[in-house]
Amino acid sequence: MLGSAYSMYISAQEVTLKSTDLTVSIAENGFYRSIQVQNEELVETGHSPLITACVKGTLVQPEKLELKKNVLQLTMQDKNVITLSYSETPNCITLEATKVPAGYDAILFGPVKVNINEVVGDVVGVVQGRGVALGVQAMNIKTIAGIPDEYIKQVKDFYQCSGKSAELSVGSIPDYKLAAVDLPDGAAFLFSCRNRSRAEKRQVQQLQNMEVLPVKGADAAINGAKIALFGCSAEQALERIGAIEVEQGLPHPLFDGEWGKTARSAMCSYLITDFSEKNVDYVLDKSQIAGFKYIYHPGPFEDWGHFNWSKSFVEGGDDAVKALVDKASQRGISVGVHTLSNFTTTNDAYVTPVPSEHLLKQGRLELLMDINNSQNEISIKKTGLFALPMTLNAMMIDQELITYGEVKEEDDKMILKNCKRGAFGTVAASHGKKSPLYKLWDYPYKTLFPDLELQDKYVDRLTELFNKTGLKQISFDGLEGCSYTGQDDYAPARFVEQFYRGVGHNVLNDASRLSHFTWHVHTRMNWGEPWGEAMRTGQVENRIKNQNYFKRNLFPRMLGWFLIRLADKKFECSTMEDLEWALSESAGFDAGYAMNISVNTLKKHGQMDQLLTAIRNWDMLREKKCFTSEQMERLKDPSTEWHLEKESENLFSLYPLSITKHYHCSLGELQPGQPGGADWSISTPYAGKYAFRLKVEGEGYIENPKFVTEKGTIAFPCKVEEGQYLLYGFDGKAHVTDKNYNIIASVVPQGDAEVAAGDSHIAFACDKDEESAPDVTVRFITRGAPEKIHYQ
């Protein structure tokens, strides 16, 4: 504890704690009398307790506060006593529960209700308003954001703290799981710590009475639960959290000496591709064209659990991965890999041939008879464990795994039918009636889960392979699977912190879920998007929704994954216009992204190097903050289109584009004697030259297409066959290409035909194959005057 500037004093009515910009006064009944940040009063006297205890389904508040031997002693309504140690530093005030009655189920720090909510950082635990910020930070993984599940209704009803959930692309986070809840008249901070020392039956994944094993070690007890409170000006909130991390020993990842939450490199874009040791040189070549500093493999493992490497990735295990990583490092590129955290494949050695006793169990089933080693109908006592459909339908008895096909109820028993004995390569055996039969948790990915003890071994293996190989990026996908243990946000935080503490170098990382404590570890969040839509329509609203989530939680911004594809039955090959739409969104939101390009696409896309160069140019300008705030506002609008052109090393031109709808000409629907063609109405804000993308579909071909406007005629002496394109650019060059834009022939246009601004007409004509009648689809692109962007 520091000297007099931050020392605690006590009067007859209250205890006061101080830190820079923050003064906290606690009344003699154990309730907050005042919380002031820069002299702004943020609480109403007597509404927020220092601690609420959760005991046997009831809430117990404090009724008396005393200072004894430099600790705060709270006498609760049930006459039990909780002691809290405290500290005051320039950065924060900490409160740690040092003695909590063993019979308590959990404690809440507060809840603390405040009267500001201009910006509510619901996950990070920072509320801003009237120019100031108040924050609460958990100091360890046992102290979690939100309310224990069994006490949600009591707490929300009693303290009137129901508010907004956190909405993001992967789903919403309910208000009772948040660090700070946005309320109609302010906000509420919610932090808790539960007693994890005993085996319990809890609700897990919508199932009641699931088996939850006790936690071993110091994390099991409520003693040690700890928070930090801080106050500052709103613009200093992020900086203050960084200082608290360093001071209090929280995770504080650095990128080249700079904190990850402020480093520009935290929002760097990266390449996702299915490279291997056999083609990594080619992938590195392409990565350097795009300026990517990270390449990331989406599926390098043969199994999840032991995390053995797939032979299609490398053939020499960890040593071969290290050689690959070293090769990339010599070219300034880091390598990352994808995991599904604690998801466990059924080919892993923790499952087969002898399953680990630490596979995660839902609960125990009671056999009604002995079973032999081939019996495929098994009778058990009736249970509620089958209320939620599973995927693998796996059970464990002794050293055998069994799967069932269906469940039939008969009176007070259930019959498991179509059982597969010795499932997943285990050995079928006979078992006595009293042998424990366990129903296992699984996931729709056809995976199982470990309990916490086995989960730790998964992390040990991941830290081992990262330390040994030098890998520098990981995605903790499926991190929510850790919560299947019944240990809420503690379980994923344990996974992430153990990995962070165990790896000897900084690892850029993201995850499928962001929680309060893992905020300190994760570099950023970056979710994959479904590939069932075109790039510019794939979850646009969700991508934008995520930006608001990142901003209010003081977190590096990412736009998600984008896919560059080859042509298939449903989609055309990705275009430069599609890509630059995504890149302009990235520039507008100042958010990184992942570009998913398979090695096959890298090789077969005819414009790949141009696309990669565009990525490099846009990212260079974004990373150096070369776009003005006014330009960024326009760029982030998803209805706008843009093209960036490099003029010199330090000068770029940014063109606004107008891209028309698709115009169609069905050559099979012409009247007798009518020449092939169509008349189209076009509307564009930009006059002058245009580019276009013409595609021929259906049987046959066209020849000599031409376009006529009120300003002239332009013709293209060429033949375009089924599935081919005629591409015409603003540079005056035209090419016939295949479906993936590989050039088949270059074409010299004849004439010129500019368009006028506003509404006008374009006439299309062509010669066609007399024996067939293909369809022609055309999309026109016009552009406005460029804005000059200087790279510095």
Regions found by a protein language model. Give the residues of each.
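Glycine-rich, aromatic-flanked loop segments that form ligand/cofactor-binding clefts
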Residues: 236-255, 288-296, 320-363, 432-433, ...
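Extended Gly/Ser/Thr-rich low-complexity repeat segments
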Residues: 29, 82-92, 105-120, 385-400, ...
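Carbohydrate-recognition beta-sandwich/jelly-roll modules
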Residues: 17-295, 327, 334-335, 472-473, ...
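Aromatic-lined carbohydrate-binding/catalytic grooves of carbohydrate-active enzymes
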Residues: 256-364, 441-459, 463, 469-486, ...
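Glycan-recognition surfaces
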Residues: 346, 350-364, 440-457, 500-602
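Intrinsically disordered, low-complexity segments enriched in serine, threonine, and glycine
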Residues: 421-429, 433, 684-792
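Autoprocessing Asn-cyclization modules and mimics
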Residues: 341-428
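Carbohydrate-binding surfaces of carbohydrate-active enzymes
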Residues: 321-345, 350, 358-365, 585, ...
